[in-house]
């Protein structure tokens, strides 16, 4: 076997590999000898089939198997001998021209192929004790707890029928409706016994406003225009009319925030309800603060660990990111111009994001490997169970899906590993707490999540 390195450019390597026909033939003969005692052919006793006859019958298929095995073994040796860590699966270019390929399968030609690989960079880790980050802290105020409980109360408030009354803002109007665009009904444009909470802005602009003043038994024609960014593209920006029949009008009834109200929500008292709400708000704030400090930590790692990353990994990450961007724009019926940019500029920006993600992923993986940070099978199982609970009635199907799909299981393990490495780094870094308001905590949160 001859191996010649033909490229050593950055993280890319290429090799020309030649395996003699004699070596391939010897391997093929050995496999045919194994087959001799296994195959049954008419006219021959078991185990007595001549190897020459086996070669005529099975020669090409055996040689094909030998070539595949030889390529895999040779590639493995090259990677091992050079101490490479592969970024992606190797690319193998085998002979494609028919005479050459036939000659290989018939055992009369040397195997000559090209191997292209992309390797992971060697990463020099910085001193994590030099990293300084702020951890934002928000104290949950009584006012925030009271506001949250009031929202819960409003969502659970009873409604009382307005006998002969006219609908006001805040009332619940129950309607049947049929919608028309250009005089024709459209999919999803009909509904029966639909509750509309006036003033909630739960329907397209102008719909709720035109229901003010209606009464039970009333019939109205509503004229509206679908938003330009409406999810259903065929309706976006179009004028529509809705023929509406009012079934009932109900006003919000009285509701007292007391122990009895708390019991309707599964709490033994109003005080216990407040404790539960405070804990939930505190948990939400802690999650947001975690994202902020994680973003700051990743920014610091990105600044202190600049190195070339495998183009193939960047392309994979960019493809995933870009696909989601296009899907989101399509779902909202928006364009890059609507976002104040061009497709070219957006591509450049998201490619930078993809490169950052790949680089940080490699850094975190290196930190985890050097410090023996691992995710246990129990932790993965608990995470899968948690995901399965999000699909009531389908838990078993979800569990089986993850059990049968290694890629899906890896998607569960990866974030668990990342959070463990982040915890490890935060133990080493200089973390100072800073008390801020709720508004300051959630400022630019979406940008933080996208960049992280």
UniProtKB/Swiss-Prot annotation:
Can you say where in the cell this protein is located?
Cytoplasm
| Span of domain PPIase FKBP-type | 170-255
| Source organism of the structure | Xanthobacter autotrophicus (strain ATCC BAA-1158 / Py2)
Keywords, sorted A to Z: Cell cycle, Cell division, Chaperone, Cytoplasm, Isomerase, Rotamase
Relate the protein's function as given in its record. Involved in protein export. Acts as a chaperone by maintaining the newly synthesized protein in an open conformation. Functions as a peptidyl-prolyl cis-trans isomerase.
* Gene Ontology MF term list: peptidyl-prolyl cis-trans isomerase activity; protein folding chaperone; ribosome binding
Task: Name the domain of life.
Answer: Bacteria
Protein name per Swiss-Prot or TrEMBL: Trigger factor
Query: Per the record, what about its domains?
Result: Consists of 3 domains; the N-terminus binds the ribosome, the middle domain has PPIase activity, while the C-terminus has intrinsic chaperone activity on its own.
Supply the InterPro entries for this chain: PPIase_dom_sf, PPIase_FKBP_dom, Trig_fac, Trigger_fac_C, Trigger_fac_C_sf, Trigger_fac_ribosome-bd_bac, Trigger_fac_ribosome-bd_sf, Trigger_fact/SurA_dom_sf
* Recorded family membership: Belongs to the FKBP-type PPIase family. Tig subfamily.
* Catalytic activity annotation: [protein]-peptidylproline (omega=180) = [protein]-peptidylproline (omega=0)
Enzyme class (EC, first level) = isomerase
Cell division in keyword set: yes
């Amino acid at each position: 076997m001859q191996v010649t390195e033909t490229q050593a450019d950055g993280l890319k390597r290429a090799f020309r590999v030649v395996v003699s026909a004699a070596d391939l033939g010897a391997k093929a003969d050995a496999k045919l000898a194994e087959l001799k005692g296994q195959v049954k052919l008419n006219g021959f006793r078991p185990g007595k089939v001549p190897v020459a006859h086996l070669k005529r019958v099975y020669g090409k298929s055996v040689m094909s198997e030998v070539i595949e095995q030889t390529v895999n073994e040779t590639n493995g040796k090259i990677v091992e001998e050079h101490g490479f860590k592969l970024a992606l699966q190797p690319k193998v270019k085998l002979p494609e021209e028919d005479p050459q390929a036939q000659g290989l399968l018939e055992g009369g030609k040397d195997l000559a192929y090209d191997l292209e690989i992309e390797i992971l960079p060697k990463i020099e880790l910085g001193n994590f004790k030099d990293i300084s980050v702020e951890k934002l802290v928000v104290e949950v105020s009584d006012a925030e707890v009271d506001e949250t409980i009031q929202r819960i109360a409003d969502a659970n408030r009873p409604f009382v029928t307005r006998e002969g009354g006219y609908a006001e803002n805040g009332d619940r109007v129950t309607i049947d409706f049929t919608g028309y665009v250009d005089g024709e009904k459209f999919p999803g444009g009909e509904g029966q016994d639909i509750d509309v909470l006036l003033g909630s802005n739960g329907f397209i602009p102008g719909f709720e406003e035109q229901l003010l003043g209606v009464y039970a038994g009333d019939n109205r024609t509503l004229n509206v225009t679908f938003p330009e960014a409406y999810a259903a593209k065929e309706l976006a920006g179009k004028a529509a009319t809705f023929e509406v029949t009012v079934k009932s009008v109900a006003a919000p009834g009285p509701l007292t925030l007391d122990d009895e109200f708390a019991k309707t929500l599964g709490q033994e008292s109003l005080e216990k309800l407040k404790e539960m709400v405070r804990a939930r708000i505190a948990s939400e704030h802690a999650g947001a603060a975690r994202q902020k400090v994680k973003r700051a930590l990743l920014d610091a790692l990105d600044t202190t660990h600049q190195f070339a990353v495998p183009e193939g990994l960047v392309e994979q990450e960019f493809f995933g990111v870009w696909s989601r961007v296009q899907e989101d724009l399509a779902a909202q019926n928006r364009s890059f111009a609507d976002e104040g940019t061009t497709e070219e500029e957006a591509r450049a920006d998201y490619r930078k994001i993809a490169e950052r993600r790949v680089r940080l992923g490699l850094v975190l993986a290196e930190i985890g490997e050097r410090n023996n940070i691992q995710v246990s099978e129990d932790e993965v199982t608990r995470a899968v169970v948690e995901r399965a609970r999000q699909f009531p009635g389908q838990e078993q199907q979800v569990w089986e899906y993850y059990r049968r799909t290694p890629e899906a299981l890896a998607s569960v393990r990866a974030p668990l590993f990342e959070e463990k490495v982040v915890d490890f780094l935060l133990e080493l870094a200089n973390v100072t707490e800073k008390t801020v308001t709720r508004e300051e905590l959630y400022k630019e949160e979406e940008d933080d999540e996208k960049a992280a």
